[in-house]
Every structure is written in structure tokens, then in C-alpha cells.
Curated annotation (Swiss-Prot):
The gene is mutM. Monomer. InterPro entries: DNA_glyclase/AP_lyase_DNA-bd, DNA_glyclase_Znf_dom_DNA_BS, Formamido-pyr_DNA_Glyclase, FPG_cat, MutM-like_N-ter, Ribosomal_uS13-like_H2TH, Znf_DNA_glyclase/AP_lyase, Znf_FPG/IleRS. The lineage of its organism: Bacteria, Pseudomonadati, Pseudomonadota, Gammaproteobacteria, Enterobacterales. A zinc finger (FPG-type) spans 235-269. It comes from Escherichia coli O6:K15:H31 (strain 536 / UPEC). SUPFAM superfamilies: Glucocorticoid receptor-like (DNA-binding domain), N-terminal domain of MutM-like DNA repair proteins, S13-like H2TH domain. DNA binds at H90, R109, K150. It holds the Pfam family zf-FPG_IleRS. This is Formamidopyrimidine-DNA glycosylase. The active site is at P2 (schiff-base intermediate with dna), E3 (proton donor), K57 (proton donor), R259 (proton donor).
């Protein structure tokens, strides 16, 4: 599933092609996604794109009459293509632009979403989200406060969108390794100093991945069709049995809440 860096990489890739251009119309070939494509999207006509934003893993296209909310689901991608390029099997939604280009949504598993809202504030998919990890609101003091009474392992707690958004499975594993914190540690056992370090490395890991265009393990592609290159820099994720790049100890894989967790028994305590 695309996580925050992948979604942010796509946002940065599509923004220059959309802002200042006008959506002439939408083409919905298959509206049966995780939730049905909103009826308002079918009727889009002559709508200039004012901004392309991101909240958590949602892309937000600002139009004069409202907002398009896009979620990529498990296997979705967005690409900027020439309008004349014919669609393929899993190309479900196009936004045809005034500049001769098309924003094309591809999703083999159809678990993404295209929603419409007049106002973002209070929308049910956005209403209960925690702070952005790259914002000043997410810091060691905040993390320590939220962990203080939490009797659960730190790894799944980091992946809870009510604590902080966008730190999915890959980046939770990578950040805990960078901070030297074992994923099974109770959240409440973390000191303020550990929380300050963890908050810093989460930001650093996410920013580095964004610079590399995200992580491609299977389906993810950037808006130009290229893979994300952060996969080349993964320290623990997906490396079960391989030697730790720091100490040489074999990387261990376990599961938390049915999600794979990777760590080094020597480097993480």
C-alpha cells in the first residue's frame, strides 16, 4: 500500500501539470472502487485546479466548487499522460485537462477511492486523523505524552492514524531501527529522550524516502511511471534472514496485528 512518502511523491509529480490547468471533463470507466466514485466526479466540467494538497495518505484536488479526495488503496497509482494515449485494463478514472494531458488513475485491486466534498473540514475520512509527521505538531514531547499510558507495543501504535498519520508498515519498521527501539517495547516504556529521537528519525526517514520518490516493492509507480528508489536503502523491511547492515546479525521478521515487522535483535532494545 502506498504510504505517506509515495503519496507525497505523487502529489509533487502531478501538481505542476494540474494547477493552473482546467479539468475539461472526467472519464469514469469503472466506478466500483472501495467506495463508489462520487456522482459529482462524473459530472465535472470546466473546473480549474486551484491546488493539489495532501492529508495523511489522501490527495486533495481543490476546485472552485469543492474538493476531489483521492486514496490510492492497495495498488493505485496516478500518472500524467498524453490525452491520446489509450487506456489499459485497470485504468479506471481519467481527468482530461485543458493542457492536452490526462490524469489517469490505475488500480488493479480497485481498493482506492475517488470522493467529492464541498468542504474538507469534518469529512468522515479526514475528521479523526492525528498530526502530520513532518509538521511541528509532531515532536518528542507530543509522542511521549501520547505513549505515556499506552500499554501496547510501539510498532502498531506508530501505525495508528489517531497518533500520527502516514507512518505505515515500512516506515514504522525503518524508523524504529534507526532509533534503536525494539518494535515489541511497550509504548509506555519509552523515555522522553527516546521519544524525541524517534520523532526526529521518523521525519528524517520519511523525508529521505520522499526525496527518492518513495518505495516500490510491487505495484507503486511515481506519476512519471518510474519506481520509487527508497527500496534500495531499506535497512530492515523485507530483509528477513539477511545480515543487519550495521552489526551483521540476521534480520528477524514477526507479526503485529497481522502486519509483518522487521528488526535487528542486536541493534534494537
Amino acid at each position: 500500500m502506498p504510504e505517506l512518502p509515495e503519496v507525497e511523491a505523487i502529489r509533487r509529480g502531478i501538481e505542476p501539470h494540474l494547477v493552473g490547468a482546467t479539468i475539461l471533463h472526467a472519464v469514469v470507466r469503472n466506478g466500483r472502487l472501495r467506495w463508489p466514485v462520487s456522482e459529482e466526479i462524473y459530472r465535472l466540467s470546466d473546473q480549474p485546479v486551484l491546488s493539489v494538497q495532501r492529508r495523511a495518505k489522501y490527495l486533495l484536488l481543490e476546485l472552485p466548487e469543492g474538493w476531489i479526495i483521492i486514496h490510492l488503496g492497495m495498488s493505485g497509482s496516478l500518472r500524467i499522460l498524453p490525452e491520446e494515449l489509450p487506456p489499459e485494463k485497470h485504468d479506471h478514472v481519467d481527468l482530461v485537462m485543458s493542457n492536452g494531458k490526462v490524469l489517469r488513475y490505475t488500480d488493479p485491486r480497485r481498493f482506492g477511492a475517488w470522493l467529492w466534498t464541498k468542504e474538507l473540514e469534518g469529512h468522515n475520512v479526514l475528521a479523526h486523523l492525528g498530526p502530520e509527521p513532518l509538521s511541528d505538531d509532531f515532536n518528542g514531547e507530543y509522542l511521549h505524552q501520547k505513549c505515556a499510558k499506552k500499554k501496547t507495543a510501539i510498532k502498531p501504535w506508530l501505525m495508528d492514524n489517531k497518533l500520527v498519520v502516514g507512518v505505515g508498515n515500512i516506515y514504522a519498521s525503518e524508523s524504529l531501527f534507526a532509533a534503536g527501539i525494539h518494535p515489541d517495547r511497550l509504548a509506555s516504556s519509552l523515555s522522553l529522550a527516546e521519544c524525541e529521537l524517534l520523532a526526529r528519525v521518523i521525519k528524517a526517514v520519511l523525508l529521505r524516502s520522499i526525496e527518492q520518490g518513495g518505495t516500490t516493492l510491487k505495484d507503486f509507480l511515481q506519476s512519471d511511471g518510474k519506481p520509487g528508489y527508497f527500496a534500495q536503502e531499506l535497512q530492515v523491511y523485507g530483509r528477513k534472514g539477511e545480515p543487519c547492515r550495521v552489526c551483521g546479525t540476521p534480520i528477524v521478521a514477526t507479526k503485529h496485528a497481522q502486519r509483518a515487522t522487521f528488526y535487528c535483535r542486536q541493534c534494537q532494545k
